[in-house]
């Protein structure tokens, strides 16, 4: 396809390259729309607003498994991993025991189940298990809320602490954060979730303004570099 137009935050329009060496698509024009909210994407698919979409939510994935009129599910393995990033220059999360408390407080299998249903698993590497160069790296921190509280006490926060989690406006990230929030609260870590557009959130994380965030790493080409 040949690029025609980019409408910032909305869509990219292209037309078929009739001089392409391989098989030509049956359609003349292609529009790629940017729809951040997963529920909105799926509604557009159901109502015919788009012909295809990816990154459907866990709940909509379960619906597709049961059949949705007019829709076909192509179930493929993802190369994406999600992970928490802490600003280790920040006064609070630079303390290793605070970071341990954040980790021990989370029941990762339960959080993944709540956020994604049966469409995801807990990562044990920074590289997705679907990639050919994946290898097991480490066991994730086991869920141990009492140990999380001990870590907080050792860090100097026996009565708990307040943190702010900065997120990009991406449904998957928000779903994960909201699933984790109650686990953190149970051990005394009160996390306020603040959602910004991608550019603002990225700037806050890159400049160190954010305490910590959740990011995702995709590897669509299969090339780790």
Q: How would you describe each model-predicted region?
A:
Residues 1-4, 12-13, 28-34, 160-169, ...:
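Short, well-ordered beta-strand elements
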Residues 62-75, 207-212, 223-225:
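Ligand-binding "clamshell"
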Residues 17-63, 190:
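Ligand-site clamp/hinge motif
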Residues 51, 182-225:
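Periplasmic binding protein-like
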Residues 1-25, 29, 146, 150:
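Gly/Pro-rich hinge or "lid" segments in bacterial periplasmic/extracellular proteins
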Residues 64, 72-86, 89, 93-131, 175-176:
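Periplasmic-binding protein-like
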Residues 121-154, 171-175:
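Structural transition elements
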């Amino acid at each position: 396809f040949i690029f025609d137009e980019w409408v910032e935050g909305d869509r990219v329009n292209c037309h078929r390259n009739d001089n392409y060496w391989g098989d030509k698509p049956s359609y003349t024009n292609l529009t790629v729309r940017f729809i951040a909210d997963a529920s909105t994407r799926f509604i557009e698919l159901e109502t015919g607003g788009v012909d295809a979409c990816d990154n459907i939510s866990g709940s909509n994935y379960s619906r597709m498994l049961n059949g949705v009129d007019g829709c076909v599910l192509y179930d493929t393995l993802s190369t994406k991993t999600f992970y928490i990033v802490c600003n280790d220059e920040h006064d609070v999360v630079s303390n290793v025991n605070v970071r341990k408390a954040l980790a021990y407080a989370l029941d990762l299998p339960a959080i993944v189940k709540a956020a994604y249903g049966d469409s995801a698993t807990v990562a044990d590497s920074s590289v997705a298990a679907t990639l050919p160069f994946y290898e097991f790296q480490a066991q994730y921190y086991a869920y141990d809320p009492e140990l999380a509280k001990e870590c907080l006490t050792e860090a100097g926060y026996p009565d708990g602490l307040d943190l702010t989690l900065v997120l990009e406006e991406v449904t998957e990230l928000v779903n994960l954060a909201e699933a984790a929030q109650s686990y953190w609260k149970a051990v005394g870590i009160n996390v306020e979730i603040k959602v910004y557009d991608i550019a603002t959130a990225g700037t806050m994380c890159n400049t160190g303004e954010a305490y910590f965030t959740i990011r995702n790493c995709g590897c669509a080409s299969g090339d780790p570099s």
